[in-house]
């Protein structure tokens, strides 16, 4: 579905982030590695900057005073942020699209600090080559899969009268489930690695991520998949 494609080939990474996580409040500013590393979200941003296929990065968060520490940190680093409705995440993406006018959007969540840059680049290129509305990966570790969407499809979603509150919150749900959109799922690994949990949702997840970042120091930051699979092979109990 093509609706007013921008006259450029800009790829925008949109990071969803908020300070009000139910299970681990303020996690986006917790240090990686512990105790004196950079905030989780800054580690994530620095990794995204390694991807040559990404032109711009923006953080979209919700409104309210609780987000102030995050906004202040992003401002101090010169990182653009946009605030909007907490539950209507799609509207925040639309605001980012209207500000940056990209052709392609990479959806990133701030609780997933591990990204394989090679897989990310491959997914973006595949999405563009296929002129797809939505592309996602599977078979990567839990918290490493990638989502790419055309900006025009997200703008079209925002105008639909039949979109539900849940679909506005989860942004890409309708792109995958609605046959009107041209979507594709890439099996990014021969073996399903989804049992390897590397997302950060709980204190235990954070402790694991902090240790993994400590182990990753002095190793290539653009090869997270190799690092995670090697670490899992050597220390499987870390991922239990």
For each of these PLM feature ranges, what is it?
Residues 10-15, 41, 56-59:
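Hydrophobic targeting segments
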Residues 1-25:
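N-terminal nucleotide-binding beta1-loop-alpha1 segment
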Residues 68, 114-196, 204-207, 211, ...:
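Conserved core of the sugar-phosphate nucleotidyltransferase
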Residues 63-125:
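Short phosphate-binding loop-to-helix
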Residues 28-33:
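Short glycine-enriched, charge-decorated loop/helix-capping segments at active-site entrances
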Residues 11-12, 55, 103, 133:
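Conserved acidic residues
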Residues 39-56, 77:
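A short, N-terminal amphipathic alpha-helix
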